[in-house]
UniProtKB/Swiss-Prot annotation:
GO molecular function, one term: P-type potassium transmembrane transporter activity
Keywords: ATP-binding, Cell inner membrane, Cell membrane, Ion transport, Magnesium, Membrane, Metal-binding, Nucleotide-binding, Phosphoprotein, Potassium, Potassium transport, Translocase, Transmembrane, Transmembrane helix, Transport
Predominant cellular place of this UniProt entry's protein: membrane
UniProt similarity note: Belongs to the cation transport ATPase (P-type) (TC 3.A.3) family. Type IA subfamily.
Top-rank taxon, per record: Bacteria
GO CC annotation, single: plasma membrane
Alphabetized InterPro entries for the sequence: ATPase_P-typ_cyto_dom_N, ATPase_P-typ_P_site, ATPase_P-typ_transduc_dom_A_sf, HAD-like_sf, HAD_sf, P-type_ATPase_bsu_IA, P_typ_ATPase, P_typ_ATPase_HD_dom
Top-level EC class as recorded in UniProt: translocase
Protein name: Putative potassium-transporting ATPase ATP-binding subunit
EC number: 7.2.2.6
Record localization: Cell inner membrane
Summary of the function given for this chain in its UniProt record: Part of the high-affinity ATP-driven potassium transport (or Kdp) system, which catalyzes the hydrolysis of ATP coupled with the electrogenic transport of potassium into the cytoplasm. This subunit is responsible for energy coupling to the transport system and for the release of the potassium ions to the cytoplasm.
Length: 569
C-alpha cells in the first residue's frame, strides 16, 4: 500500500475541519482552552448586547456592537478551525489505514501450521490469537507478530519510508516510546555517533595480512581463517574469503574439526577457536596484548609498528595470536560515507558537538575522525566508557543524544537524554531507548535533531510573533480608543485611526484574520537552516519579532481605512 501525501489544505480535511470548528463552539469544548473561553464568553456577551440594542432595551449602536460580536465569533471559529485542521491531518493517515483493514481479507489458518487449511475472512473479524498466512503481494491485514518465515514489506503507509524493510520471525518494532523525545532532540548539544554504519559505510572488509617477524603470511592467514570460521559478522566472513583467495585455503566446518568456537564479547573484545591443543584468538590490540601477557608471552615490537601503520591509514588492525605467540595483523578497511563531513560542519554551526564512538584503537579512531570531521572521539570504547562519557557531558549541563543497537549499549541509551535504538537491535536496547528507528539507520539521529530544532524554532517564532503582535496592537488601539477621555493620548496615535470605534473594530478584525494567516506556518513549520544559537535568535527577532510589530500597524490601518470608506465605524 502506498502512502498518500497530504496537501497542506486537503479539500476533504477542510470540510471536516469546518464542521468540527462549529461543533467546538459548545461551552464544554471551549472550557478546555481558558484563553479561547474568555473570547467565547465575550462573543456571547456582545451578541446579547446586540440583541438588546436591536430590541431597544438599551441604547447604543446595534450595528457597531453587532459587527464586534460577529468578528469575535469569527475569532473563536478560526481558532477552532486551526485546531480541528491540525487534528484532522494527524488522524487522516490512521483513518486511511482503518479503511484498508475494512476492505482487506486475511487467510486465517485453522491450525498453527503454514500448510493448514485456511479460511478467507475480513480483516476486521480477526481476533487476538488468530494465525494468518501472508503471501507475496498481500496486504498485511492487521498488527501482529511474525511467528514463522520472513518477507520484504512495504511499510510506507505507517512509517512514511518508501524503502521496503525485512520483517521476520523474532523481529518487532516500535516508534517513539518517549513522548517528549523529539522535542528534547531540539535542545541536544552533544551527539554520540557509532563509527560503523553511521560515519562509515559499515562494511569493513579484510584487505591485508601482515605477518610478524619470523611468521610467513600463509601461516597467519590459516590461523586467521580458523579463528573466523564460526564468525558470522561481515568482517569475519571477509577474513575467511581473503585467506581462500590469497592462499586457496578452503573453508572448514567447526563441527567436523571437533573445535570449540569462542564468541566475541564486549568485555573480552576478541574471538577465536580452540582446536586440539591450539588456542587461536583474534581481536583488538589491547585485548590481545593482555591475553599474551597473561599467558606469559611478549608482544613483539614489529607487530606494534605494523598496528600503528595500519591505524594511521584509517584501517582497523586486528591481531592474531596462537597461545602466547603473536602471528601478525589483519587490516580491516572501511569507507567514510560521502557527504558526512559537510553534515557534521552544519551541526557544528548549530553549536552541536559530534563525538565518534568506536572500538578501534586511538590511532585508527583519530585518522577516521579527522577524515569525517567529527569534533572528538572515544576510542576502544566499552559499555562502561560510553556510560561514563555521557554522565560527564551531563554533569557539564549538556544534553546528550546517541544511537545503539546492542545489549551492551542499553545502559548508555538509558542514560542519554535522547536515545535512538535500532529496530534491528536487541530488545534490551529498544527498551532502553526512547525512540526506535524502524529502518535501523543510525544516521537518522541527525534527522531527529533537525526535526527537534525545527519544532523549537516554529514554537519560538510563533511565540515571538504573538508577543510582538499583541504589543503592537495595544499600542495602536489604546491611544485612539481612549483619546476622547484622555486627550493627551492623541500624541501617541501615530497611525491616525479614524475614531475610537474604528480602532477597536479594526483590532478585532485583524486579530481574527491573523489566525487564518498563521495556520500554514504552524502546520508546515518554520524553515530551518543550520545556524548558531545567537544567529538563529537574531534571525527570528528580525523576521518574527520585527514582523510581529510591523504587521499589526499595517493591517489595522488598512482595515481602518476600509471601515471608514464603508462607513461601518
Amino acid at each position: 500500500m502506498s502512502r498518500k501525501q497530504l496537501a497542506l489544505f486537503e479539500p476533504v480535511l477542510l470540510v471536516q475541519a469546518l464542521t468540527d470548528a462549529v461543533k467546538k463552539l459548545s461551552p464544554r469544548a471551549q472550557w478546555r482552552n481558558p484563553v479561547m473561553f474568555v473570547v467565547w464568553a465575550g462573543s456571547v456577551l456582545a451578541t446579547l448586547l446586540t440583541l438588546a440594542m436591536v430590541t431597544g432595551q438599551i441604547a447604543g449602536s446595534a450595528l457597531f456592537t453587532g459587527v464586534i460580536s460577529l468578528w469575535l465569533w469569527f475569532t473563536v471559529l478560526f481558532a477552532n478551525f486551526a485546531e480541528a485542521l491540525a487534528e484532522g491531518r494527524s488522524k487522516a493517515q490512521a483513518n486511511s489505514l482503518k479503511g484498508v483493514k475494512k476492505t482487506a481479507f486475511a487467510r486465517r489458518l485453522r491450525a498453527p501450521r503454514h500448510d493448514a487449511q485456511a479460511d478467507n475472512v475480513p480483516a476486521a473479524e480477526l481476533r487476538k490469537g488468530d494465525i494468518v498466512l501472508v503471501k507475496a503481494g498481500d496486504i498485511i491485514p492487521c498488527d501482529g507478530e511474525v511467528i514463522e518465515g520472513g518477507a520484504s514489506v512495504d511499510e510506507s503507509a505507517i512509517t512514511g519510508e518508501s524503502a521496503p524493510v525485512i520483517r521476520e520471525s523474532g523481529g518487532d518494532f516500535a516508534s517513539v516510546t518517549g513522548g517528549r523525545a523529539v522535542e528534547a532532540a531540539g535542545d541536544v548539544d552533544v551527539l554520540l555517533l557509532d563509527k560503523t554504519g553511521t560515519i562509515t559505510l559499515g562494511n569493513r572488509q579484510a584487505s591485508d595480512f601482515i605477518p610478524a617477524r619470523g611468521v610467513d603470511e600463509r601461516t597467519l592467514a590459516d590461523a586467521a581463517q580458523l579463528a573466523s570460521l564460526a564468525d558470522e559478522t561481515p568482517e569475519g566472513r571477509s577474513i575467511v574469503i581473503l585467506a581462500k583467495q590469497r592462499f586457496n585455503l578452503r573453508e572448514r566446518d567447526v563441527q567436523s574439526l571437533h573445535a570449540t568456537f569462542v564468541p566475541f564479547t564486549a568485555q573480552s573484545r576478541m574471538s577465536g577457536i580452540n582446536i586440539d591443543n591450539r588456542m587461536i584468538r583474534k581481536g583488538s590490540v589491547d585485548a590481545i596484548r593482555r591475553h599474551v601477557e597473561s599467558n606469559g608471552g611478549h608482544f613483539p615490537a614489529d607487530v606494534e609498528q605494523n598496528v600503528e601503520n595500519v591505524a594511521r591509514l584509517g584501517a582497523t588492525p586486528l591481531v592474531v595470536v596462537e597461545g602466547a605467540r603473536v602471528l601478525g595483523v589483519i587490516a580491516l578497511k572501511d569507507i567514510v560515507k560521502g557527504g558526512i563531513k559537510e553534515r557534521f560542519a552544519q551541526l557544528r554551526k548549530m553549536g552541536i558537538k559530534t563525538v565518534m564512538i568506536t572500538g578501534d584503537n586511538r590511532l585508527t579512531a583519530a585518522a577516521i575522525a579527522a577524515e569525517a570531521g567529527v569534533d572528538d572521539f572515544l576510542a576502544e570504547a566499552t559499555p562502561e566508557a560510553k556510560l561514563a562519557l555521557i554522565r560527564q557531558y551531563q554533569a557539564e549541563g549538556r544534553l546528550v543524544a546517541m544511537t545503539g543497537d546492542g545489549t551492551n549499549d542499553a545502559p548508555a541509551l538509558a542514560q542519554a537524554d535522547v536515545a535512538v535504538a535500532m529496530n534491528s537491535g536487541t530488545q534490551a536496547a529498544k527498551e532502553a531507548g526512547n525512540m526506535v528507528d524502524l529502518d535501523s539507520n543510525p544516521t537518522k539521529l541527525i534527522e531527529v535533531v533537525h526535526i527537534g530544532k525545527q519544532m523549537l524554532m516554529t514554537r519560538g517564532s510563533l511565540t515571538t510573533f504573538s508577543i510582538a503582535n499583541d504589543v503592537a496592537k495595544y499600542f495602536a488601539i489604546i491611544p485612539a480608543a481612549f483619546a476622547a477621555t484622555y486627550p493627551q493620548l492623541n500624541a501617541l496615535n501615530v497611525m491616525g485611526l479614524h475614531s475610537p470605534n474604528s480602532a477597536i473594530l479594526s483590532a478585532v478584525i485583524f486579530n481574527a484574520l491573523i489566525i487564518i494567516f498563521l495556520i500554514p506556518l504552524a502546520l508546515k513549520g518554520v524553515s530551518y537552516k543550520p545556524l548558531s544559537a545567537s544567529a538563529m535568535l537574531r534571525r527570528n527577532l528580525w523576521i518574527y519579532g520585527l514582523g510581529g510589530l510591523v504587521v499589526p500597524f499595517i493591517g489595522i490601518k488598512v482595515i481602518d481605512v476600509l471601515l471608514t470608506l464603508l462607513d461601518l465605524a
